[in-house]
């Protein structure tokens, strides 16, 4: 197993600087991570710096609350792709899910999938805020909307990926969708536990530490 190719090397902090973006880009090149995952404002620069490499550029949409309108998420997705994004991690409308407005949740995801125009879409369901029933429903709606992955967490809601949630999500989507575990994956043991539970992608700022078998104190 090539661990690096399962990692989205991530920097989504509010105060991310160009120097920090350069660091994760250089690390991604050196370790050959699957992607760098950065906020939309950094997509064009990251795309330019990674041109000619195998490292993809991933970005986040409706992040971290999922509470922007569907039209805004759609535009944000198109803009990100125009700037060079190759993978899209979107946040669902969490409030609508909790209200039982499932059509609204599905339509929101569908709009992003359509705007992504064939690019990989990962749907962040924010597991820490959901009941088990809501987690299952969020996965089902993501599948119905045409997404490619379901993803556990933004890392901004006070909790991250757990083995139990990854197993539940994997059991729900089977082999039809993939599962991305993110938030709190800090070391090789965490990484291995998530992969064993069914994740096929890991979102982490601790990518280097994971590969080196070291511990990180980062939250994402």
From Swiss-Prot:
Compartment(s): Cytoplasm
Cytoplasm is among the record's keywords: yes
InterPro entries xref list: Aldolase_TIM, DeoC, DeoC/FbaB/LacD_aldolase, DeoC_typeI
Biological processes, Gene Ontology terms: 2-deoxyribose 1-phosphate catabolic process; carbohydrate catabolic process; deoxyribonucleotide catabolic process
Keyword Cytoplasm: yes
Family in the record: Belongs to the DeoC/FbaB aldolase family. DeoC type 1 subfamily.
Name under which the protein is recorded: Deoxyribose-phosphate aldolase
Originating organism: Staphylococcus epidermidis (strain ATCC 35984 / DSM 28319 / BCRC 17069 / CCUG 31568 / BM 3577 / RP62A)
């Amino acid at each position: 197993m090539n661990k690096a190719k399962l990692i989205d090397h991530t920097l989504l902090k509010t105060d991310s600087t160009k120097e920090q973006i350069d660091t994760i880009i250089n690390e991604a090149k050196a370790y050959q991570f699957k992607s760098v995952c950065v906020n939309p404002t950094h997509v064009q620069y990251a795309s330019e710096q990674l041109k000619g490499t195998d490292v993809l550029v991933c970005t986040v949409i409706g992040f971290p609350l999922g509470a922007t309108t569907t039209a805004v998420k759609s535009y944000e997705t198109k803009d990100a792709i125009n700037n060079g994004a190759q993978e899209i991690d979107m946040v669902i409308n969490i409030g609508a899910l909790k209200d039982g407005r499932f059509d609204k949740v599905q339509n929101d995801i569908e709009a992003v999938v359509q705007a992504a125009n064939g690019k990989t879409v990962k749907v962040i369901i924010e597991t820490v805020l959901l009941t088990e029933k809501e987690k299952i429903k969020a996965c089902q709606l993501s599948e119905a909307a045409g997404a490619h992955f379901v993803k556990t967490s933004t890392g901004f809601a006070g909790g991250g990926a757990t083995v139990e949630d990854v197993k539940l999500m994997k059991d729900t989507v089977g082999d039809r969708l993939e599962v991305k575990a993110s938030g709190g994956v800090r070391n090789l043991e965490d990484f291995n536990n998530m992969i064993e539970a069914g994740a096929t992608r890991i979102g982490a700022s601790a990518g280097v530490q994971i590969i080196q078998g070291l511990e990180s104190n980062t939250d994402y």
